[in-house]
C-alpha cells in the first residue's frame, strides 16, 4: 500500500535495466490474516469488512488497494502496459502520457495479450493457440460482466 506512479516507473526502469525475460507484475493482494492486510486496514486502504470474497481469484487483474491509492488509476494503466514499457524501445515515453488516460478495453486487451506472450514463451507453446483460447475467455468474461451488471440493474 502506498505505491506512487513514480515508484511504479522506477520498478519498470529496474526491470528494463535487468533485461528480464518475463515481465510479469501483479497487484498486491492483502489477504485477511496477514500483516499487509492489517497494515492496509489500520492505514485506511481497506475497511474492516474486507474478506477473501473481495479479492481477484487469479490475483492478476485487480487489487482492492488500487481504489484507495492517490495514483491508483495511473498505476492500473501502468500495470496493464508494463510489459510493453520493458520490451518496446522508447515505449516508456508514451507510457508516461498514457497513464493519464482512463483504463479501457484496449489497455485490458494489451495486458492480457502480454500475459499470453509470457505464458507461451515460458511454457514453450504456440502463441497462436494460446491467443485463440484467450480471445474466447476474454469474450466470455465480458459477457458475464455485462450479464451481472444487467442483473444488478434489474434488482435495483
Write out the residue ranges for each language-model feature.
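A structural motif corresponding to the C-terminal lobe/cap of the Radical SAM core domain
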Residues: 1-100
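Membrane-proximal basic amphipathic "stem/tether" segments
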Residues: 77-156
